[in-house]
C-alpha cells in the first residue's frame, strides 16, 4: 500500500462528482472543505499520534479498512446509508469507494518509481505537490493547508453514524468516534505545523528527532513530513517508462494515469448508483469485487 494521497483524492473527488447519481448530490455540500475532509478519511490512520515518538496506532483501523475486508466494510456502509435514507451518508460511501480505487491504481505507479534514494513517501509527496501546484497555482511547500482547508478536520455525527456500526461488525472495534477524532486532530496539526518549512530549518530538526526519538516500528519518520520545494519530473514519467500494473504492462504518464483513474471511478460510481437506485441491488457490487453475498431482504 502507498502513503497518504489525500491531496490527490481531493482533486479526483472534484472531478468525479459528475459520475454520482444527481439525486444523491442534489442539495448536498460538495464544497472544497467537505471534499478534503472526506479525502482524508481513507488514510486517516497516518495522522494518529503523528508527532508522538512513544505511541503508535495500535488499533490500525484505517489500515484494516484498506485490507482484504474492504468490500465487506463498504457493503455494511452502503446498507447503513440505505436504511438511514440520508443522502449525505450515501455520498460518503462514494468517497470511500473512490479512495479505494485511487489507492489500487496508484500503488503500482508509486512502487515503480520508488528507489533507494526516492522512497514511497517521497514519490507520494511529489505527486501531491504536482497536482496541488498545478491546480491551485501556488506552491504547496509554502502553504498552510490547515488554513487553506480550514473546515475539513472533523467528522460530524452523520459521518460517525455511517461508519460506527460497520466498523464494529467487520473489525470488532468500538471506539470509532474517539479514534477518528484523534486522527483528524493529528491531520490538522500536521498540515498546520509539520508539512512545510519556509526557512528549511525543520529538515535537520526532523532528522535529529528521527535519530534520537522516533524508533517505534511502523512509526512514520518525520523526514517524510515535508513537501518538496521542487517537482522531480522523473516521477511524472514524461519519458513513458513502462511499468507493471495489476499484471499488465503500461507506460502512463502521471497525467494519463489520472485520467485512467477517473475511468475506473466511473465504474465504481455506477456500482453504487445501481445499489442505491434499485433497492439495494448487489449484482454490480458482487461482479466488481468478484464476491457473492447471500443477502437477506431488508424489511
Identify the residue ranges that each predicted region occupies.
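N-terminal leader/auxiliary helical segments
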Residues: 1-94, 98-299
Amino acid at each position: 500500500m502507498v502513503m497518504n494521497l489525500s491531496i490527490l483524492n481531493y482533486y479526483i473527488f472534484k472531478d468525479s462528482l459528475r459520475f454520482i447519481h444527481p439525486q444523491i448530490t442534489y442539495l448536498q455540500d460538495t464544497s472544497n472543505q467537505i471534499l478534503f475532509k472526506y479525502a482524508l478519511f481513507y488514510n486517516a490512520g497516518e495522522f494518529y499520534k503523528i508527532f508522538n515518538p512513544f505511541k503508535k496506532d495500535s488499533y490500525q483501523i484505517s489500515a484494516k479498512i484498506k485490507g482484504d475486508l474492504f468490500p465487506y466494510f463498504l457493503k455494511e456502509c452502503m446498507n447503513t446509508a440505505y436504511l438511514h435514507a440520508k443522502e449525505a451518508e450515501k455520498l460518503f460511501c462514494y468517497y470511500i469507494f473512490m479512495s479505494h480505487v485511487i489507492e489500487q491504481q496508484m500503488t503500482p505507479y508509486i512502487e515503480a518509481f520508488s528507489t533507494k534514494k526516492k522512497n514511497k513517501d517521497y514519490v507520494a509527496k511529489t505527486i501531491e505537490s504536482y497536482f496541488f501546484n498545478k491546480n491551485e497555482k501556488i506552491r504547496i511547500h509554502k502553504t498552510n493547508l490547515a488554513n487553506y482547508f480550514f473546515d475539513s478536520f472533523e467528522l460530524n455525527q452523520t459521518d460517525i453514524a455511517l461508519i460506527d456500526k460497520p466498523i464494529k461488525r467487520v473489525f470488532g472495534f468500538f471506539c470509532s468516534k474517539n479514534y477518528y477524532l484523534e486522527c483528524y486532530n493529528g491531520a490538522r496539526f500536521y498540515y498546520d505545523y509539520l508539512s512545510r518549512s519556509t526557512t528549511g530549518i525543520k529538515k535537520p530538526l526532523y532528522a535529529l528527532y528521527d535519530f534520537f526519538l522516533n524508533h517505534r516500528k511502523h512509526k512514520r519518520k518525520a523526514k517524510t513530513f515535508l513537501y518538496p520545494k521542487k517537482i522531480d519530473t522523473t516521477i511524472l514519467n514524461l519519458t513513458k517508462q513502462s511499468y507493471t500494473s495489476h499484471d499488465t504492462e503500461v507506460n502512463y504518464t502521471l497525467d494519463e494515469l489520472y485520467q485512467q483513474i477517473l475511468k475506473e471511478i466511473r465504474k465504481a460510481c455506477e456500482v453504487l448508483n445501481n445499489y442505491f437506485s434499485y433497492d439495494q441491488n448487489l449484482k454490480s457490487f458482487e461482479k466488481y469485487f468478484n464476491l457473492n453475498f447471500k443477502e437477506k431482504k431488508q424489511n
